[in-house]
Structure formats: structure tokens, C-alpha cells
């Protein structure tokens, strides 16, 4: 038989005790075997530099290195609050380095053979704006030795422009129209269909969700960012739909004008 212990840290010592039992129920001698997991040999000469720029809902993490010929990079990206970062990779540079060094084939860890850099960058799509993110990168040289991990934490900020508040003339003149099309019971949920018609020259974002999902938004600006992050950009004429709705849900809408100024959101009770 074979005994496997996965997810162990480098340099972990283990002792295996085993005993055999025959058909008559008689025990044999206790067998003892000690072993330890290997400790990676790092190339301390490799240095990595990371920097980040942002597009709309996209973060581009620029990767560069020197000190050795590099054949590939291994990297992890995600939100600092995610369980992948806090629980699996341990939430620190040191713990992430330890994990990545022995689990480079884990689905959480990407490499540039499978996901090449784009113009020298790791491209993070659909990032949550105004939330802290982390990128951890390790390089592998031609001899198969890894560099030390380099970590970059960053918060991609959504530019709200000159925020326009409820009741202002510009707010009133650009407020989108929301039309409820149906609310059909489906088991324990409701299928809710609605349509948003933005004013000319504006782009709207919408979501249908329970008010509890918006708890923690203390200001109109925070609510606008939450809708932008978790909702969808409105395509004029398209019917929006949620499959697991509740009659207590609200439809939230925020919008921005051609100058990039966001507007205080509105909400509508499901009809």
C-alpha cells in the first residue's frame, strides 16, 4: 500500500508507524520510518520588480527581473480578502513563497508557459475596484531553481470624476428609466426581468439584489462602486435578468456621463 500526505511545508519531518495483522488477528512488529520534505534551493541572485497600471476593470502587473536567465514565471493574483490568499497561501509573502515552491502545479498558481505575459504584464481582468489585491511572482532559471517570491499589494481605484448627487439638475436630466417586464415564481426563487434605458450620452450599470448585499456602503459613492463592481454594464435595449431573485430585491442603477462623472445611484422595488 501507499500512504500520501499532501500540502506539507518544506522541511517538515514525519514519522510513519505501521503494523501488519495476519488472518488470525496476530500483530507483527511495529515498523518505523522517518522522512522529511525537501527544502527548495533558491537562486538568491534573481531579483524581481513589479509595478501596476489600470484600465477599466483591468489591472496590468508589469513583471521584470535580472540576475539570471529566466525560463518562466509562476504567479498568484487575487483579492487580499479571498480565502485563496488568506487560508491557502497563508496571507504573507513568506507563506506564499513556501506554498508556491512546492505547489506550482496547483490550479491557484499560474505560469507563463500556460498563461504568457501580455506586453510583459500579468493581466487581471474583472478586478474589484477599490478593493485591495495582491500579486506574488516567482521566477525559474534555466537550471530549474526558483527565485524568492516578490509581492505587490495594490488598490485599483475607480475614478468617479465629479460625483453628481441626487436632486441636482444634471442628475435629474440624465436619470435612466427602469422598466420591469416580469417577476415569475420559480420554486423558492423569482425570475426577475427588467430593462434600463440610459439617457443619451450616458453609460449605466445595474444589478438586481437584496438590500442586504449593499450593507456596508456608507455613502452614495461607495454604493456606486459596489454596483459597478457587482452589476453589469447596460446594453441599450437588452433585457436584464436574475434567475435567483427575491421579491424583496431592489434594482439598483448608477450611471456616468461622457466626461466620466458618476451619478448617485437610484433603486427600484421589484414590481
Locate predicted features.
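Surface-exposed, short loops/turns at beta-strand junctions within beta-sandwich domains
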Residues: 4-13, 110-117, 123-132, 231-248
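Solvent-exposed serine/threonine-rich low-complexity stretches and specific carbohydrate-binding patches
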Residues: 87-115, 217-233
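Solvent-exposed loop/turn segments flanking beta-strands in beta-repeat/beta-sandwich domains
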Residues: 64-98, 196-220
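Structural beta-strand segments of beta-rich domains
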Residues: 57-61, 190-194
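Extracellular recognition modules
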Residues: 15-21, 134-140, 250-256
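Short, solvent-exposed loop/linker segments at the N-terminal edge
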Residues: 52-57, 182-188
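Proline-enriched interdomain boundary motifs that mark the N-terminal boundary
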Residues: 42-50, 161-166, 171-179
Amino acid at each position: 500500500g501507499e500512504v500520501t500526505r499532501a500540502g506539507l511545508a518544506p522541511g517538515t519531518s514525519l514519522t510513519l508507524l505501521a503494523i501488519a495483522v495476519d488472518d488470525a488477528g496476530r500483530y507483527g512488529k511495529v515498523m518505523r520510518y522517518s522522512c522529511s520534505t525537501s527544502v527548495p534551493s533558491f537562486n538568491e541572485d534573481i531579483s524581481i520588480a513589479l509595478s501596476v497600471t489600470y484600465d477599466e476593470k483591468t489591472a496590468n502587473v508589469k513583471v521584470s527581473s535580472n540576475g539570471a536567465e529566466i525560463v518562466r514565471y509562476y504567479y498568484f493574483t487575487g483579492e487580499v480578502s479571498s480565502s485563496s490568499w488568506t487560508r491557502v497561501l497563508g496571507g504573507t509573502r513568506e507563506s506564499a513563497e513556501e506554498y508556491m515552491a512546492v505547489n506550482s502545479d496547483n490550479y491557484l498558481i499560474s505560469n507563463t508557459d500556460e498563461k504568457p505575459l501580455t506586453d510583459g504584464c500579468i493581466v487581471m481582468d474583472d478586478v474589484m475596484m477599490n478593493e485591495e489585491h495582491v500579486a506574488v511572482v516567482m521566477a525559474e532559471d534555466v537550471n530549474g531553481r526558483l527565485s524568492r517570491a516578490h509581492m505587490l499589494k495594490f488598490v485599483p481605484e475607480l475614478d468617479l470624476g465629479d460625483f453628481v448627487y441626487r436632486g441636482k439638475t444634471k442628475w435629474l436630466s440624465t436619470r435612466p428609466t427602469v422598466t420591469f417586464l416580469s417577476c415569475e415564481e420559480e420554486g423558492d426563487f423569482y425570475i426577475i426581468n427588467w430593462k434600463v434605458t440610459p439617457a443619451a450620452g450616458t453609460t449605466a450599470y445595474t444589478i438586481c439584489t437584496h438590500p442586504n448585499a449593499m450593507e456596508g456602503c456608507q455613502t452614495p459613492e461607495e454604493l456606486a462602486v459596489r454596483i459597478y463592481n457587482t452589476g453589469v454594464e447596460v446594453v441599450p435595449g437588452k433585457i436584464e435578468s436574475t434567475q435567483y431573485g427575491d421579491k424583496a430585491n431592489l434594482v439598483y442603477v448608477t450611471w456616468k456621463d461622457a466626461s466620466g462623472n458618476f451619478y448617485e445611484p437610484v433603486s427600484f422595488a421589484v414590481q
